[in-house]
Amino acid sequence: EIGGAIENPLSNPNGYKFYQANPSPSTGGNNVDARHVACWVQGMYDPNTGNRLLMIPPEEIASVRLGNQNAGSQAERITYEFDVQDDLVLLMKYAVVLENPGHGDAYDPYFGLEILQEDGTPIDSEASCGEAFFSPSKDPEKWNHYTPSLGVRFVWKDWTTIGIDLRKYKGQKVKIQLTTQDCTLGKHGGYAYFTLDCISATISSEGCDTVSLEAPSGFKYYWYNDENKDFKPTTNQSIDVLAGDTTTYYCKVTYLDKTDCNFVLSSAVIPQFPKAKFNALFKANNLAFLFFYINILI
């Protein structure tokens, strides 16, 4: 989805910015003009950050790049809408790369992220937990800087993780909307990478003696338990408990850059039951398909 008109919250709140429409949003990952690109090669770094920003964050198998480094007063948008059917927490990771012309918020390249309710209003609007807006002139001390050549300056934001508790939106539609745009004067561009995932609001684990309960990476943590008086609260990402422990542990997960934004995960320790372990071998034999199951000795 590419703009004719896309509103920029960092510019005049009473007006809109206008951009040249382009009917070709994607032209392939090897083309500098590509606007919607799937990145799946591990260990690749973005050259416009001095090869310091991973194009795929740790623990992920792929990412999507929205936008390109070309200028021309253009804009791109990706919108994803889905039905919340389970007790889920939405996890999004994003990184931003923008040229820095120093024009000011109203004219600079821009990246926006919004997570919206079914009626279009922002989720967690009071704390702004489901939105993020960036331009080079906004909070300049929070950017990383790279100047590859005379007259070209880039700012970039390393991978950041946000999480939204969707349990109260169960049965509703949720919309995720990301926007990138060039500077309005036509000479500078920008783009962003992102990944998207959902996890259960209950952390479950199984084992024989002790089990590890681990919260998602990219946050601050506070584990606590109201039932087990011997348990000492901790700020580690994970805790180890006995396999027979049936009490419920809770982890308060807080954004790194927005301390008012958090969600709480609960735990469930599941007893370990014996399971068969085998490899499957598939062969095509004339018109027949043969499957072989080979037991693995433990």
Regions from the PLM with identified roles:
Residues L196-I298:
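Proline- and Ser/Thr-rich low-complexity, intrinsically disordered segments
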Residues E1-S200:
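Aromatic (Trp/Tyr/Phe) and Gly/Pro-enriched flexible surface segments
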